[in-house]
UniProtKB/Swiss-Prot annotation:
Gene Ontology annotations for the cellular component aspect, listed alphabetically: cytosol
Keyword annotations: ATP-binding, Cytoplasm, Helicase, Hydrolase, Nucleotide-binding, RNA-binding
Record NCBIfam families: PRK04537.1
UniProt motif DEAD box: location: 166-169
Annotated organism of origin: Xylella fastidiosa (strain 9a5c)
The protein, known as: ATP-dependent RNA helicase RhlB
Domain spans labelled Helicase ATP-binding: 40-220
Name of one Pfam family that matches: RhlB
Subunit composition and interactions: Component of the RNA degradosome, which is a multiprotein complex involved in RNA processing and mRNA degradation.
GO biological process: RNA catabolic process
Compartments, record wording: Cytoplasm
Length: 543
């Protein structure tokens, strides 16, 4: 938060509890921001409000002042149980809940109020015990709170006096709306409690929720998205897909030491971008949905302290973050939703400061640009991708194959997949000849004349067993995934098993054969049934 004088309304001019006013002054808050000046007079009078304001405009302090002032000014119920909180604040993400808690403790921790922070990803039993001991204000994410609400002896909302929904539009985006309705139905009647709703956009679905669960809320709009984006210096580049990393590195080299956030649309590409920045020598942190909660908190703390230069994040992970001093925001991928664009660039230019937002519109995401420009009601200036901006990428080292040649670094798994794909297409990798120091004989034509059983996609290498005449030994092949015992046929979909004839004594080495070919004739000697039939015919001819 900041005490930057964005309005002339002083906190001392409001009807605040003396202890609360002292805490605000001690924390450095003297003048109100526009959203605070607009909402505090209405909310302090006990009215419900639906306020529209961007993150970083001071709305967190606005509803915290209302909550704390109400609890200090009005005594709680005498028969209130420890598990009955007087106030509830709901946030869509863990990071936002943590930041609200930290702000609440900053100026309200010495006022005799107990705050409880409830969110997933951390010790379940510890939080449950905290709720059982009692708290005046519960700051929570919906999912973990519902878990405790279903355990009736842990927490109850039957005497809750005031409820706050922060980032209400994000609740819809993350699919929490059913959870929110579940929680609101367990509060006292809407005429018996006060409800404050804050959202970056007061869309139809947000207002529908407000009118359904709030008591004649007053709609208050502090500023539109266009006003917010005018404080951000925006520009957009149109790079090819392969130019995005070099362009990002080139632009970052021109703003060394600046606190930067890079937004990527998917978790898969987050890792790739972060790896490229790390290899270029930057101190990088990754914030995505797969990062464990404790690690997320550590990363945010290090980024806030300046130990990390760049934070690469997805929209879900970074929504609602309150990080001061972010100078640059890069949209490595243009977002699909225009609202997400506004939320991204809102990480910079907070509380009246200036910032830079740089976007890349590649062929994959450029179609989002018209909607974004229509939403913010302005054209984003276009910058040219020049050769001077593209940083050269170092070529990866190539390993030697032992013969003086260099080979690409192909992982064994990728090689196995490639070999399997080629065999499924009937095109074996490589040509007959030396392989792993052993001679290889090319695959011959099918002995069944092309008819009969369908060939399988597996292959086996068979070799003569010199100790057993006429035995065929299937050996582990590249794409079989099965190790066979000597003298036994192995494979999928073999059907009826047949005895195989011995190999021609003139053959040597390895023969590449399918499992179907292993089971058919492989030499000139007749099978056992053939020899028996020949013997019977000979005996009949004697008579």
């Amino acid at each position: 938060m900041s005490d930057k004088p964005l309005t002339n309304l002083n906190f001392s001019s409001l009807d605040l509890h003396p202890a609360l006013l002292t805490g605000l002054t001690r924390a450095g808050f003297t003048l109100c921001t526009p959203i605070q000046a607009l909402t505090l007079p209405v909310a302090l009078a006990g009215r419900d409000i639906a306020g529209q304001a961007q993150t970083g405009t001071g709305k967190t302090l606005a509803f915290l002042v209302v909550v704390v002032n109400r609890l200090l000014s009005r005594p709680g119920l005498v028969n209130r149980n420890p598990e009955d909180p007087r106030a509830l604040i709901l946030a869509p993400t863990r990071e936002l809940a943590i930041q609200i808690y930290n702000d609440a403790v900053k100026f309200g921790g010495n006022l005799g109020l107990r705050f409880a922070l409830i969110y997933g990803g951390v010790d379940y039993d510890k939080q449950r015990e905290m709720l059982r001991k009692g708290a005046d204000v519960v700051i929570a994410t919906p999912g973990r709170l519902i878990d405790y609400l279903k355990q009736h002896e842990v927490v109850s909302l039957r005497v809750c006096e005031i409820c706050v929904l922060d980032e209400a539009d994000r609740m819809f985006d993350l699919g929490f709306i059913k959870d929110i309705r579940f929680i609101l139905r367990r509060l006292p009647e809407r005429c018996s409690r006060q409800t404050l709703l804050f959202s970056a956009t007061l869309s139809h679905r947000v207002l529908e929720l407000a009118y359904e669960y709030m008591n004649e809320p007053e709609k208050l709009v502090a500023e539109t998205e266009t006003v917010t984006t005018t404080r951000v210096r925006q520009r957009i580049y149109f790079p090819a897909e392969e130019e995005k990393i070099p362009l990002l590195l080139g632009l970052l080299s021109r703003s060394e030491g600046m606190r930067t956030m890079v937004f990527v649309n998917t978790k898969v590409f987050v890792e790739g971008v972060a790896r490229a920045l790390d290899e270029a020598g930057y101190r990088v942190g990754v914030l995505s949905g797969d990062v464990p909660q404790r690690k997320r908190e550590t990363l945010l703390n290090r980024f806030q302290k300046g130990q990390l230069e760049i934070l690469v994040a997805t929209d879900v992970a970074a929504r609602g973050l309150h990080i001061d001093g972010v100078n640059y925001v890069y949209n490595y991928d243009l977002p699909f939703d225009a609202e997400d664009y506004v939320h991204r660039i809102g990480r910079t230019a907070r509380l009246g400061a200036d910032g830079d937002a740089i976007s890349f519109a590649c062929e994959r995401y450029a179609m989002s640009l018209p909607d974004i420009e229509a939403y913010i009601e302005q054209k984003i200036p276009v910058a040219a991708v020049t050769a001077e901006l593209l940083a050269p990428l170092s070529r990866p080292e190539r390993a030697s194959n032992g013969n003086g040649d260099t080979v690409g670094d192909i992982s064994p798994h990728s090689l196995d997949v490639l070999v399997a794909q080629e065999w499924r297409r009937g095109k074996p990798r490589g040509s007959p000849g030396e392989r792993d120091g052993r001679p290889r004989v090319g695959k011959g034509p099918r002995s069944d004349g092309g008819g009969g059983r369908r060939r399988t996609k597996f292959r086996l290498e068979t070799e003569r067993d010199s100790s057993v005449d006429g035995a065929v030994t299937p050996v582990f092949g590249v794409s079989t995934g099965i190790v066979s015992a000597p003298g036994k046929e192995v494979g999928r979909n073999l059907g009826r098993r047949r005895r195989s004839r011995s190999m021609d004594s003139g053959e040597s080495g390895h023969v590449v054969a399918t499992t179907a070919q292993v089971a058919v004739k492989s030499g000139s000697q007749p099978s056992l049934l053939g020899r028996i039939g020949h013997r019977i015919r000979s005996l009949l001819n004697m008579f």
